[in-house]
Amino acid sequence: MGYLLTKPKYKTREFLIKTAHHEEWPGYFDLKKEPFELKLRDGYIINGDVSLNGDSKKFFILCHGHGSTREGSTKYGLMYFKLGYSIVRYDQRGHGDNVRCKCTMGANESKDLIEIINYVKNTYGQDIKISLHGASMGAATILIATRYLKKDDIKFIVADCPYSSVSNFGGDFIKMHHQPRFLLTPVFNFIMRVFFGIKKNDMSPEFHVKTCDIPILFLHGAKDDFILPYHSDRIFKAKIGEKEQHIFPNGTHANSVFDDPEEYERVVVDYVKRHE
């Protein structure tokens, strides 16, 4: 389990572009994208792109999930672009166009996101307004990053189907394979800490939102059988301050935007307009 999480089966950008729901997002792939490379604190280089929306001061940074690429965020980009936002996409550490490396399920990726936020502000102006949207591990990455962020830094967050902690997610995986969860979950946590150098709370959105004052919209599909809906429930309950939650009855994992597109757009657009 630890190996599968830290060394995921990667999808290529080319594969995701080919298999994307082009008919659902007409015109998005025609948007002009300005590529960027960002050298991080440890020398690692992150690849991404920006679709500027005229002179807009509103930016959305999109974070993709485990094993995916920035194309995994494309399905949300056009919705925000139509609302007047410039769109920033990037490949998470070890994914997409980046050099392969260990995935830490949000522990290091959350620090990367902070550097990307700073890069966007330094490039496009300290007066821009940044919001964040993530799905699955992308949502978890954002929520873990809130330990470094305040309401003055980020307008609001849209978190779609995050795990409450990798420990809980690992426990679900163990239970799904009919193994004793109460015995093996501590073993899983030990392996992640000793062999992969990742502490339990470093991979726990539920732990970090306890001090987060940024408004958050939590989304989850009721039919998500990969990251079960209770994960969002736990984070929602732990989060202090302003928060909202919506469950999509027909939504599967990270696919509510396709499983219930009209309702998804209605909920998100309404939230965005109320929090701009």
Regions found by a protein language model. Name each.
Residues 1-39, 49:
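An N-terminal hydrophobic leader/cap segment in hydrolases
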Residues 76, 214, 228-237:
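Short alpha-helix in the alpha/beta-hydrolase fold that links the catalytic acid
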Residues 144-198:
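Hydrolase active-site cap/lid region
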Residues 251-265:
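Catalytic histidine-centered segment of alpha/beta-hydrolase-like enzymes
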Residues 95-128:
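Catalytic nucleophile-loop/oxyanion-hole region of alpha/beta-hydrolase
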